[in-house]
Amino acid sequence: MRSIIADSKRLVVKVGSSLVTNDGKGLDHAAIGRWAAQIAALRAQGKEVVLVSSGAIAEGMQRLGWSKRPREIDELQAAAAVGQMGLAQVYESRFTEHGIRTAQILLTHADLADRERYLNARSTLLTLLRLGVVPIINENDTVVTDEIKFGDNDTLGALVANLIEGDALIILTDQSGLFTADPRKDPAATLVAEANAGAPELEAMAGGAGSSLGRGGMLTKILAAKRAAHSGANTVIASGREPDVLVRLAGGEAIGTQLIARTARMAARKQWMADHLQVRGHVVIDAGAVEKLTAGGKSLLPIGVTDVQGAFARGEVIACVGPDGREVARGLTNYSSAETKLIHRKPSGEIESVLGYMLEPELIHRDNLVLV
């Protein structure tokens, strides 16, 4: 089996905290130097690379003399602010040794949820790549809140892959890849060499959480691969402990788990809707509506809605949940939650008699609806 990275030109590489720190006690300068050298080798092959790097909070903890990761958000943000300075400096120094300039970009979900800022971020990243710069991206932990944070850099890496229409996302971790079960508990567990991104059985295999230093377990990596597939990006989950792992992947060696994007690439606007707009509420839909959305490519009509949950305004994103509780789609609603509660289970022809007006016959038009 040949590595999918060999034929990929535009890469997003995500490096976890454990691979750039001394067991959480500050940055591992030598390790960062090795990552810079490998990325320089990829650049020499004509590949474009965007790096998503953890490590700011761990470095901040070291500089502040803290041995345990704080729980209070203000202390985490303070550690991130202190540590981000050191992280950027070390990367700049190590890449300069190879004649490569770097750029620091800090993002929040709010940056990408706003369409204009999303397009600006995309334009900036593409310009940096055109100029031969390696963008180094992290979540802006200093200002982020629970409502607008990505939650982990695996998710951020996937969103960046979507943003720049990357060919592949490489998630480097301290694990060898995805196993059929937890290899620490099940001696019969085997490595999943290749699978389809988004295959439902992968989430069951992924299981538990990550370490206390980082925020991402294997499940977040599987979900990140599913998200990256929205734009057609394949994903590799591999051990960053493997010597020259990036160079070997680029050379065609199959390492870790390859998750292939089999689904059709989403249109850019729908991809943005699916990835970056915050869900404000939910509607439960019947089996007939699920069938029409998933197989028929139809709009969601009020008659197919059986329940309305949460408070949302017209034009906000709501999730469509089937009778089994699984989300099947999300989209921009034409009616508020208060209006939807009045018109759900009713034919579109009765909307005007119930509300006194009819904005649209659909609750969500198919052009504003994305299957998930």
Curated annotation (Swiss-Prot):
Assigned keywords, A-Z: Amino-acid biosynthesis, ATP-binding, Cytoplasm, Kinase, Nucleotide-binding, Proline biosynthesis, Transferase
Protein name per the record: Glutamate 5-kinase
Lineage of producing organism: Bacteria, Pseudomonadati, Pseudomonadota, Betaproteobacteria, Burkholderiales
PROSITE patterns: GLUTAMATE_5_KINASE, PUA
Gene Ontology biological process terms from the UniProt entry: L-proline biosynthetic process
Pathway terms, separated by semicolons: Amino-acid biosynthesis; L-proline biosynthesis; L-glutamate 5-semialdehyde from L-glutamate: step 1/2
Cited function: Catalyzes the transfer of a phosphate group to glutamate to form L-glutamate 5-phosphate.
Record localization: Cytoplasm
Organism: Burkholderia multivorans (strain ATCC 17616 / 249)
Binding site for ATP: K14, T173, D174
Gene Ontology cellular component annotations, sorted alphabetically: cytosol
Binding positions (substrate): S54, D141, N153
Family annotation (PANTHER family): GLUTAMATE 5-KINASE, ISOPENTENYL PHOSPHATE KINASE
GO molecular function ontology, one term from the record: glutamate 5-kinase activity
Family membership: Belongs to the glutamate 5-kinase family.
UniProt domain PUA: residue ranges: 280-358
